[in-house]
A protein has these predicted regions:
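C-terminal intramolecular chaperone/autoprocessing and neck/assembly modules of extracellular spikes
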Residues: 2-8, 12-91, 112-126
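Terminal processing/anchoring signals of secreted or surface-associated proteins
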Residues: 16, 62, 98-99, 106
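Short, charged low-complexity intrinsically disordered segments located at boundaries
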Residues: 88-100
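Long, heptad-repeat coiled-coil alpha-helices used as oligomerization/scaffolding rods
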Residues: 95, 102, 106-109, 116
Length: 126
């Protein structure tokens, strides 16, 4: 059985240290420590970032977004997180997307730097 017994009653939801959130099977008010936790996602893992048709935003538009909103595009603001919390699995996917985008930006910059080094070498020869 997947039920939890608390005393002499069966509980469908479990709350520890406070009241339970109506949409949760387990609610913990306070710190919880795990040796291991597994999150299973039904959403896309961001491998799509490396697809040839992925629309990587130009860095100047990312900068404009940050200046206007004080957070990265597609990442919740501090206020949103404070008010609504976050889904750990979805947040891991968002953070991985940002890491993969940073990798693509670094590759672009590396290619530009290599091209500039070659151009400088050519100019020095002439």
């Amino acid at each position: 059985s997947s039920d939890v017994v608390l005393g002499k009653t069966w509980a469908e939801n479990l709350a520890i240290g406070g009241k339970f959130a109506s949409d949760s099977k387990l609610s913990v008010s306070g710190k919880a420590t795990f040796e291991e936790a597994e999150v299973k996602l039904s959403t896309l893992w961001p491998d799509y970032v490396f697809a040839s048709n992925y629309n990587l935003a130009p860095l100047d538009s990312v900068e404009t977004f940050i200046q206007k909103n004080s957070h990265l595009p597609n990442v919740p603001s501090a206020q949103e997180v404070s008010e609504k919390g976050i889904n750990l699995g979805n947040m891991d996917a968002v953070l991985l997307q940002k890491i993969e985008e940073l990798t693509l930006y670094n590759i672009q910059m590396h290619k530009q730097m290599e091209a500039m080094k070659a151009e400088i070498a050519t100019l020095k020869e002439n």
